[in-house]
């Protein structure tokens, strides 16, 4: 089996499995919120909704016309731009910031959300080459350079912030779940671009995202 055939054989199945897992974590987060009334579980639910939408669009993309696919992917990018900064908010709750620090943390989160929204709204879409029965959109080369810069800054910056918090939590509490949430997201996000293979980058980011959400849920369930 060629490298390309291997991708084709696992890509669609991976998306479906991850989407089902997001739905499960969404349901479990509802249960935890009803028990504990913690805002962090609402944030987890919102994250899961974004990823579930992401999965549904990718799985059904091949059945859509190009115009409809581009329209649904604009919303994908908007959700991505808004939801990535919530990792900053998660970190404030993980470190148990007092009210003043938590307020500042939320202000930073909201500023980053606005920047992410502006970047997403300025993104020009193009239909990517199909693989693994997945038809998706990506960023067109005509997209302004600042959009890519903000996207990279949000993705890498928020994850590094998580990892720093994870190191602190490990030193203070001997707790490693929060660190692993950021670690897997960073590693899986870095391997793909380093390879220069867009399909590998896409597939690994899918794995990194689901591992991040799983470890976030485990952490907050344990320490809430």
List each language-model region with its residue ranges.
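Internal transmembrane alpha-helix with an interfacial aromatic "cap," most often the third helix
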Residues: 23-33, 57-68, 78-113, 220
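Hydrophobic transmembrane alpha-helical segments in integral membrane proteins
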Residues: 1-25, 151-155
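Juxtamembrane "helix-exit" motif on the non-cytosolic side of transmembrane helices
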Residues: 30, 58-67, 119-128, 189-199
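Membrane-proximal helix-loop-helix units in multi-pass membrane proteins
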Residues: 82, 91-160
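A generic, lipid-embedded transmembrane alpha helix
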Residues: 45-63
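Membrane-interfacial loop-to-transmembrane alpha-helix junctions, especially the N-terminal start
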Residues: 35-48, 101-108, 172-183, 224
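C-terminal transmembrane-bundle signature of multipass membrane proteins
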Residues: 84, 158-224
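Non-cytosolic membrane-interface motifs at loop->transmembrane helix junctions
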Residues: 67-78, 135, 198-209
